[in-house]
């Protein structure tokens, strides 16, 4: 299905709005701190919507479509393994609270303060290389999504030359994201990502109701029941033939989520942007509510497409989808484009335009954030540490913009030439492991263990990156391209002939192995180094090192996780109440409203986790019929829909309040040209190199 003029008008309006806002935000960007971290002025609602959009991305939508198309509702069941982990990480402020206390603008700046300058440079190089390789496929996947969804031709003729449509679509999307980023840096990114986030939330709800009008709930279930018995889209305990996205996948991902929490620097500007550590913590907590509407998109849209492709009454639409897919030679790209192509057959004019605009918004919000992050990391953590003298503000901003432009050029070229040979999620994991393999140990150890040493950091990061690169080479180069020839050349080699046709480990499994090895080496080499304990109060700006602009009382180890100062002398009731809040992670910075949000979040996530545990026990011991599972999924969708609608309205109000506060604060803020992410010699806590 091709787009109607109404659809193009909707897309054009969105693009004009984004560019207009970006030009207006340029006047607010007056310093390096503005460009890198929004001058640390963002509130919770602004953060949770903008950062959520930065992490969404058209490529993430495509990856989720792959996952839920293959595993169906059952993927949501195993995904509940992640629920308590996300809850604990968000509610405790794990990593993000202490990281914000360090006042570092990039993670590698924290590495220099905590470990050494040489390690900062090494970690910055790894983060940059891992990041641009990971980001390198974004433009291509996004462009293909738009091409097949909008029904654009695969090739176009320009001056007699036949060119793939992929290139101009990628160029357009990258140019748009680049314009937003270069104009206003992190300030423009926060503002435009927030507005795009609100737009996406609304479009998701509209899309859900329109699709439900096309395919009823009963028809949806009928279509899902046509899946093979051992690849059920309804019953999570009948998935013996499901490819990749099974229980083992989610268990490993659960561990990696803890290990690498906030370690990935694709949106590093948001880590430094909160106005206080408490606002950063609340933004993470509110993310659960924001995610409800996104869950509707990720889970239900691919299931509607699955039903359409299997129900006889949609045979015409299914034939059109299959005809388009048959023209795609690469089997992995064919898998990725099945759902986008199917969605184009289900939505009417107008809604098609809204959905296309949503995909473009998701793409731009991720592109501008990643361009900003990897370009900034290259300058701040690779180039700047080599300089003996700081750059002027103007030269520093110019260098940042040049680096960001360079990242965009690399992504464009890489997307044109790299042949993606596995699921998007798997590629994310293994390319991310080049940096994340060791970074999780280095970050958590650096923030929470005073005996973590620079030797342990070097060991974890070095070994982790080597193992990850080895995994990428084995799976994507040696196994598919060299192993078949080796088997032909050495037919008598038994061990060579015994090797499987495909590499036995996927990207997630390899990432898990890398993380375990890195943790072991961080602990081992830190203990062997026998360095004196690090001054954690100085690192975290506590007690005599407290910084006034946090706008709160100095934090101690007890108050960080919620020690409310009510003692026995204040009465047994107050003492018990204080102990209760302490145990669930509430501190003095929480208002009554914050506490209500916090408790609801705990209750909501706990309900679904215990339902998962009890349901799994019943399914294994007694068994649950498909009819029982269908009732559960109906209940889940209804609850998700209610929260999705409510949170969209709630965050619309709170987000615009934060947006106006941000603009007001930036207009009156005093800029400090020395606040540029550099580290002075007296700030080093270990080596003075």
Regions found by a protein language model. Give the residues of each.
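Loop-to-transmembrane helix boundary motifs in multi-pass membrane proteins
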Residues: 113-121, 132, 162-168, 373-422, ...
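Helix-loop-helix module between adjacent transmembrane segments
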Residues: 53, 76-182, 252-260, 269, ...
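Selective recognition of specific alpha-helical transmembrane segments in multi-pass small-molecule
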Residues: 10, 89, 126-138, 199-213, ...
């Amino acid at each position: 299905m091709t787009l109607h003029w109404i659809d193009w008008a909707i897309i054009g309006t969105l693009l004009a709005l984004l560019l207009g806002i970006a030009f207006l935000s340029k006047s607010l960007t007056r310093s390096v701190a503005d460009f890198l971290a929004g001058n640390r002025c963002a509130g919770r609602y602004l953060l949770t919507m903008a950062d959520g959009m930065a992490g969404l991305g058209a490529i993430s939508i495509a990856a989720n479509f792959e996952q839920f198309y293959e595993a169906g509702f059952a993927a949501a069941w195993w995904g509940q393994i992640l629920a308590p982990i996300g809850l604990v990480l968000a509610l405790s402020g794990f990593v993000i609270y202490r990281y914000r206390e360090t006042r570092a603008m990039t993670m590698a700046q924290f590495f220099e303060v905590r470990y050494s300058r040489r390690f900062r440079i090494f970690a910055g190089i790894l983060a940059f290389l891992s990041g641009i390789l990971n980001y390198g496929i974004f433009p291509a996947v996004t462009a293909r999504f738009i091409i097949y969804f909008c029904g654009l031709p695969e090739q176009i003729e320009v001056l007699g030359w036949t060119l793939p449509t992929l290139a101009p679509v990628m160029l357009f999307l990258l140019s748009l994201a680049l314009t937003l980023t270069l104009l206003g840096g992190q300030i423009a990114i926060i503002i435009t990502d927030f507005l795009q986030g609100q737009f996406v939330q609304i479009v998701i709800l509209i899309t859900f109701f329109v699709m439900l009008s096309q395919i009823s709930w009963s028809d949806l279930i009928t279509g899902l029941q046509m899946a093979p018995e051992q690849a059920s889209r309804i019953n999570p305990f009948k998935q013996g033939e499901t490819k990749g996205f099974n229980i083992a996948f989610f268990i490993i991902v659960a561990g990696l989520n803890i290990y690498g929490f906030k370690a990935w620097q694709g949106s590093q500007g948001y880590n430094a942007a909160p106005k206080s550590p408490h606002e950063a913590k609340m933004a993470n907590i509110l993310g659960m509510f924001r995610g409800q509407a996104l869950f509707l998109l990720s889970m239900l849209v691919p299931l509607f497409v699955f039903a359409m492709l299997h129900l006889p009454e949609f045979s015409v639409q299914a034939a059109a989808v299959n005809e388009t897919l048959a023209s795609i030679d690469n089997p992995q790209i064919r898998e990725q484009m099945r759902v986008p192509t199917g969605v184009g057959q289900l939505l009417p004019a107008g809604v098609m335009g809204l959905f296309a605009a949503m995909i473009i918004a998701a793409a731009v919000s991720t592109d501008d954030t990643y361009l900003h992050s990897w370009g900034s990391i290259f300058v701040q953590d690779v180039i700047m540490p080599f300089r003996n003298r700081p750059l002027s503000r103007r030269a520093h901003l110019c260098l940042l913009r040049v680096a960001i432009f360079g990242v965009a050029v690399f992504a464009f070229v890489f997307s044109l030439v790299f042949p993606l040979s596995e699921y998007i999620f798997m590629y994310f994991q293994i390319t991310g492991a080049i940096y994340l393999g060791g970074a999780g140990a280095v970050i958590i150890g650096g923030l929470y263990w005073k005996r973590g040493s620079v030797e342990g950091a070097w060991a974890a990061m070095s070994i982790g990156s080597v193992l990850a690169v080895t995994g990428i080479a084995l799976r994507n180069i040696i196994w598919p391209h060299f192993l078949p020839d080796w088997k032909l050349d050495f037919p008598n080699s038994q061990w060579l002939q015994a090797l499987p046709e495909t590499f036995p480990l996927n990207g997630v499994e390899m990432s898990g192995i890398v993380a375990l090895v890195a943790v072991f080496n961080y602990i081992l080499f830190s203990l062997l180094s026998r360095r004196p304990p690090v001054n954690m109060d100085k690192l975290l700006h506590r007690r005599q090192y407290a910084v006034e602009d946090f706008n709160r009382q100095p934090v101690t180890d007890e108050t960080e996780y919620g020690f409310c100062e009510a003692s026995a002398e204040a009465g047994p009731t107050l003492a018990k109440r204080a102990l209760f809040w302490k145990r669930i992670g509430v501190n003095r910075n929480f208002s009554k409203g914050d506490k209500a949000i916090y408790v609801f979040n705990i209750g909501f996530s706990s309900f679904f986790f215990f339902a998962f545990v009890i349901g799994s026990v019943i399914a294994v011991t007694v068994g649950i019929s498909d009819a029982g599972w269908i009732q559960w999924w109906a209940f889940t969708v209804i609850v998700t829909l209610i929260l999705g609608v409510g949170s969209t309205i709630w965050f619309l109000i709170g987000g615009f309040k934060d947006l106006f506060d941000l603009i007001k604060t930036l207009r009156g803020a005093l800029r400090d040209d020395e606040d540029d992410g550099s580290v002075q010699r007296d700030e080093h806590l270990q080596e003075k190199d």
